[in-house]
Regions:
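Amphipathic alpha-helical repeat elements characteristic of tetratricopeptide repeat
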Residues: 24-31, 43, 47, 86, ...
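Hydrophobic/aromatic side-chain positions at a characteristic register within alpha-helices
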Residues: 34-41, 45, 77, 81, ...
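Mid-protein regulatory/catalytic core that forms ligand/cofactor-binding pockets
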Residues: 48-157
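Eukaryotic all-alpha helical interaction scaffolds
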Residues: 37, 53-57, 178, 212
Length: 231
């Protein structure tokens, strides 16, 4: 009986590990599908992902995080952030504020959900994040550089829309330290765009918009920057 009990526990453990590994594998696939669908603005595909991931959202924190990302991705593309349930917003805020360290997962959540924070909370979180990662920027992983760039660009957009006058040197400094490689080109261009917006340099603003449009990036302008920011 003792051996039988140990065997059953062992088999149960194996089954649990297989289930966890299967879920982890699905999570990786879903992440790639989410990134691709969001970049190409495929709302219908995102809706399908929301249903699919929603079946597993209570099985692990990582799965819930991904589910939240899908929910906010859809709302962002539809311009319907205000229609996200308060329960989801509350859980997302709790994830961010309860985090002991700025992991990639937490940063991803924050990057996509920045619009739900009060300005003073957003400023506090931004300050904490960029002071944590401002050193050795070029040595950060490519994935982390992309997430941090997204946070920087979203923050600049939020500050501009809110017409707030605050010190943004921490953001500009981080972007300037990113390696000069194709992956970081968009972040550097858009950071310059907002810098010109804040400085009222309308001619430079128009030049960047025209450059992006003439190089097949009109869809990025539509969803990721505030156009016509003439002061």
């Amino acid at each position: 009986k003792q051996h039988g009990l140990q065997a059953s526990i062992f088999l149960e453990r194996i089954e649990n590990e297989d289930s966890e590994n299967d879920l982890a594998h699905k999570n990786l696939i879903w992440q790639k599908q989410l990134e691709d669908a969001y970049y190409h603005q495929q709302i219908e595909r995102l809706e399908d992902l929301k249903i699919e991931i929603g079946k597993y959202k209570n099985q692990s924190q990582n799965i819930f995080n991904l589910y939240a990302l899908v929910v906010f991705s859809i709302a962002s593309l539809k311009k319907q952030i205000d229609q996200i349930s308060e329960n989801i917003k509350r859980q997302v805020r709790q994830i961010v504020f309860d985090s002991d360290e700025w992991s990639e997962s937490t940063l991803q959540i924050f990057a996509m959900t920045m619009m739900i924070y009060a300005p003073e909370d957003m400023d506090f979180l931004i300050n904490s994040i960029f002071r944590t990662y401002r050193h050795n920027v070029s040595n950060l992983s490519g994935q982390l550089q992309e997430i941090m760039s997204a946070i920087a660009i979203n923050y600049l957009a939020n500050v501009y829309v809110q017409r707030r006058k605050i010190d943004l040197n921490l953001i500009y400094d981080f972007i300037s330290k990113l390696p000069e490689i194709p992956r970081n080109a968009f972040a550097k261009i858009v950071a310059n765009y907002y810098h010109y917006c804040f400085d009222g340099k309308n001619e430079e603003v128009d030049q960047i918009i025209e450059f992006m449009k003439s190089n097949g990036m009109s869809h990025l302008i539509k969803n990721f920057i505030v156009e016509n920011c003439h002061l």
